[in-house]
C-alpha cells in the first residue's frame, strides 16, 4: 500500500511538473507569438512610413513638375505679350510716320498753292 501511495504521489508530482512544464512552454510560446506580432507590427509601421514618404516625395515631384510647366506657360505668355507690344509700337510708329508724311505733303501743297517756296 505504501508503494501505491508512493507511486500516486510520484505520479501527482510528475503530473504537476508536466503541468508546470506545459505552462512554461505555453508562456514561452505566447511570448514568442507576442514578439513575432511586435516585429510584424514594427515592420508594418516602417513600411507604412516609407510608403508615406515616397508618396509625399512623388507629390512634391509632381508639384515641382507642374510648377515648371506653369512657369514655361507663363514665360510663353510673357513672350507673346512682348511680341504684341512690339508689333503695336511698330504699327503706331508707322502711323505717326504716315501722319508726318501726310502733314508734310499738305504743307508742301499749301506752300505751292500759296506761291511760297
From Swiss-Prot:
Q: Does the keyword Protein transport apply?
A: no
- Any one GO BP annotation for this protein: sodium ion transport
The protein's UniProt keywords, in alphabetical order, are:
Ion transport, Sodium, Sodium transport, Transport
- Entry annotated with the keyword Transport: yes
Region (Disordered) residue spans: 1-20
Compositional bias (Basic and acidic residues) at which positions? 7-20
Q: Which residues cross the membrane?
A: none
Q: What is the similarity comment for this entry?
A: Belongs to the V-ATPase G subunit family.
User: What functional role does this protein have?
Assistant: Involved in ATP-driven sodium extrusion.
Q: What is this protein called?
A: V-type sodium ATPase subunit F
Q: Which gene encodes it?
A: ntpF
